[in-house]
Each structure stands twice: as C-alpha cells, then as structure tokens.
UniProtKB/Swiss-Prot annotation:
Pfam family, one: Beta_elim_lyase
Domain of life of the native organism: Bacteria
Family that this chain belongs to: Belongs to the beta-eliminating lyase family.
Location of N6-(pyridoxal phosphate)lysine modifications: 255
GO molecular function per UniProt: tryptophanase activity
Reactions catalysed according to its record: L-tryptophan + H2O = indole + pyruvate + NH4(+)
Essential cofactor(s): pyridoxal 5'-phosphate
UniProt pathway: Amino-acid degradation; L-tryptophan degradation via pyruvate pathway; indole and pyruvate from L-tryptophan: step 1/1
Protein name: Tryptophanase 1
Organism of origin: Symbiobacterium thermophilum (strain DSM 24528 / JCM 14929 / IAM 14863 / T)
Assembly and interaction partners: Homotetramer.
EC number(s) on file: 4.1.99.1
Length: 454
C-alpha cells in the first residue's frame, strides 16, 4: 500500500516562522485573538479547514467552463446533477457559504420564538443562527470521556432525543440537525445505525431532519472503516444511504466540496424547498447562483466527487491520525480517537490551573502561536457564549483547542513541527495564563472579541 500522498504538488506558497519578538508584537496588536493575526505572521495555519484547502487541476480547469448567467446557468445544473446523484435530493440551492444556508433555513423553519432545534451537537455558526432566528439550540451528544475509545463519539443520544420530544412536544421543535462529522465534539463520526435511528424517531413524531454535512465524506469514510457491513462499500454508496435518512441538508462546501468558497441547501420535498427558497433571493441571490460565481459552482461540482475518492479519504484522515498519534504518544491529552479533520487537545487537562471561565482552550491557542507560530482555535466555553436569558457564561462540555488541518496543503513534516510546538508548550504549561475580555461582542463573540491576560 503506498504511503505517500495521492497527488503531486504543482504550485507552492512560501511560508516562514517570524522571530519570537515579532510574534509577541503581532499577538498584542491582534488583541490576543488569533482571528486578528495577519496570515503573513503565521507559520502553520491550523485555525480552520474551511476554505483553506488546495483545489485540484480538474477543479481549476472546470472553472473555465463557468457560466455567469444571472439565472439558469449551465454551471448550476451541473452542480445540481452532482448533488442529486450523491444525496438523492432533487431540490438544490447554492449559497455563498455554510452560514448563508443556515441563515435562510432557520429563518423559515423557526416559525415562532422559543422553538427548539435539537442536534447531536451544534457548531458555532449553526448555534448562532438558531439563536438569531429566535430558537433554542439543544445538544444531545452521547456522553463519553475524551480519553476513552468509542468508534462513533459524534452520535446522537437517541434516548434523550425521544425523551425531549415527548416532554416538550413535537409541535415546539422546529427540526433536528444531524451534524456529520460532529465538529464540536472533536470531528467525531456518527454511525449509520445512529443516523437511521434518529430519523426513525423523527418520523414517529413528525419532526424534520436536516443534515449539517460540511464533512460528510469523512463521515462516510469512518463508517466504511468502523461499522459492520460497510467495509466493501464505496463512499458514494454509503453517502446515498446516509442521506436517505433525512429530509434535507445544509452544507459549508468549503470543507468536503474542496473549494475555497460556497455552500449548499438541498431538499427532498418541493414544499420545503419553496418555503426555504423564499428567503434565499433577498439574502443570497437568485436560486441558481446563491451569491456565487458560475466558476465556483463548477469547482464545487468537481470537488464533491473528489472528496468521496477512497484514496483521498485514506490520506486525509490518515494525516490527521498521524498528528494525533504523535501528540498522544508524547502524553498530550487529546480527544481520542482523533476525528476526520482536526486534532482536539483537551485544554482543561493540558492547563488544569486555568479556570474554565478564563478559557483554557483560548489560552492554549495563544501559547502555541508564541511557541511556534502555529495558529489554532478554541472550541469550548468561549465559543458557546452566554445564556441568552441569564447573561451568564455557559460552561461547555469540553474545553478544546482545535488543530484543524487544511486539505491537500501541508506535508507530514509540517505536522511534525506542529507536534514539536505543542510538546514544547506542554513542558512550559504552568507558565500559561488564562484570559479575560477586553471587549465582548454579543453574538459569535470568539470571532471578534478582544482579550487581555487574566
């Protein structure tokens, strides 16, 4: 079996590690928020895997076919054909990115304030758009310790799901969001059995199921590798079965469509398509372009298929595994097993002296940048935000620092540099301090907040 990447590199971008004193200056000027760092001041950028990957020669060549017609562009129909072939959903709407899809979907599905939206676990923008639409997001993730092995740690707790529907009434639930893979839980996969059971419960009570499928191809790979009965199936066939257990999807195409910009909505039912589509035109643009150029639609259509290639998926997940094993072997506490797109360091265990409301996950992001120029992001109580009713900080189930690996960008030597940076920071962990707010936005605060050392 080949050990190398299933591609050759045709173009390169220079990167460098700036001196420590320059990193200290850059972090201070960024108000101790990695989102405000200039990319030129970052050596290895693991802030996100969203839109940061490298496109293939086939995607670049497809962009030359882009039809820039305002309505009815041929590029849209090529994308629609691809989406329908993979998902079985006939009604397809492109959006400028995933949060555009979330915005229009929840604005139409949450029909009155206080309705619940249930999920195996929301990511930041999804949670934010539920709240902005007047809804209440509820996480129903299974409870497994970070250090304990479980093949599908992203699963919905179906017992709690059914209990919640019974107690609060199906009429008070706007929809169920099944997130695959489960980013906030550590990029963890969801089993086909769990997806099927969730859909059966939803149908029993007449509740809509939408997939959040930014990393659906990675989830299909994990099902193929870990779930009985799927080892001999191609990822596209696993995807088709998975989508049969839902009513529609929202997608940030910047992950498993392997593009730098774009999103999707797709539905099985014309009535649902019409309802949600009514909000697309004023927010995103006409239904056949959704805020994107035709060339972006072409690249997305190609990338959706490339992401389901078994060789690509083995490389992709294997690279994340490589970094995770280096850290775990060095005694770094991480979410285990590692997920499909990132390694999640358990910052609460890495920095036990930092209180949860001084955001150990964020404190560690600052330390990793200072130590080795590596940019990462917090996934924990900072990202979750405040209770909209009490105004108090909500303590998250995890305090993670996420090391998200862009697709087809870095080599394993880069990841060895990352591992060395984390290990060096671990040896100095008692010197790392928490943070406090210098300026706190009300919505999605982690993106634009300013901090000071605590």
């Amino acid at each position: 079996m080949p050990k190398g990447e299933p591609f050759k590199i045709k173009m390169v971008e220079p990167i460098r590690l700036i001196p420590r004193e320059d990193r200290e200056r850059a972090l201070k000027e960024a108000h101790y928020n990695p989102f405000f760092l200039r990319s030129s001041d970052v050596y290895i950028d693991l802030l996100t895997d969203s839109g940061t990957g490298a496109m293939s020669q086939f995607q670049w060549s497809a962009m030359m076919l882009g039809d820039e017609s305002y309505a009815g562009a041929s590029s849209y129909y090529r994308l629609k054909e691809t989406v329908t072939d993979i998902t079985g959903y006939e009604y397809v709407i492109p959006t400028h990115q995933g949060r555009g899809a979330e915005k229009v979907a929840f604005s139409q599905l949450i029909t009155r304030p206080g309705m619940y939206v249930l999920s195996n676990m929301f990511f930041d923008t999804t949670r934010g758009h539920v709240q902005l639409a007047g809804g209440r997001p509820v996480d129903l993730l299974i409870d497994v310790p970070t250090e304990e092995y479980h093949p599908f740690k992203g699963n919905m707790d179906t017992e709690r799901l059914e209990q919640f529907i019974r107690e609060h009434g199906a009429e008070n639930i706007a929809c169920i969001v099944m997130t695959v893979t489960n980013n906030s839980a550590g990029g963890q996969p969801v089993s086909m059995a769990n997806i099927r059971e969730t859909y059966q419960i939803a149908r029993k009570y007449g509740v809509l199921v939408l997939f959040d499928v930014a990393r659906y191809a990675e989830n299909c790979h994990f099902i193929r590798m870990r779930e009985e009965g799927y080892a001999d199936k191609h990822p596209i066939d696993i995807a088709r079965e998975m989508f049969s257990y839902g009513d529609g999807l929202m997608m940030s195409a910047k992950k498993d469509a392997l593009v730098n910009i774009g999103g999707l909505l797709a539905f099985r039912d014309e009535e649902l398509f019409t309802k949600v589509g009514a909000a697309v035109v004023p927010f995103e643009g006409f239904l056949t372009y959704g805020g994107l150029a035709g060339r972006d639609l072409e690249a997305m259509a190609v990338g959706l298929r490339e992401a389901l290639d078994p060789d690509y998926l083995a490389y992709r997940v294997g690279q994340v595994q490589y970094l995770g094993e280096m850290l775990r072997n060095a005694g770094i506490p991480i979410q285990w097993p590692v997920g499909g797109h990132a390694v999640f360091i358990d910052a609460a265990k890495f920095l036990p002296h930092v209180p949860w409301d001084q955001f150990p996950g964020h404190a560690l992001t600052l330390a990793l940048y200072l130590e080795g120029g590596v940019r990462t992001v917090e996934v924990g109580s900072l990202m979750i935000g405040r209770d909209p009713e009490t105004g108090e900080n909500v303590r998250g189930p995890f305090e993670f620092t996420r090391l998200a690996i862009p697709r087809r960008v870095y080599t394993n030597l880069h990841l060895e540099d990352v591992a060395e940076t984390v290990i060096n920071a671990f040896q100095k962990r008692e010197e790392i301090r928490g943070v406090k707010f210098a300026r706190e936005p009300k919505v999605l605060r982690h993106f634009t907040a300013w901090f000071d050392p605590a």
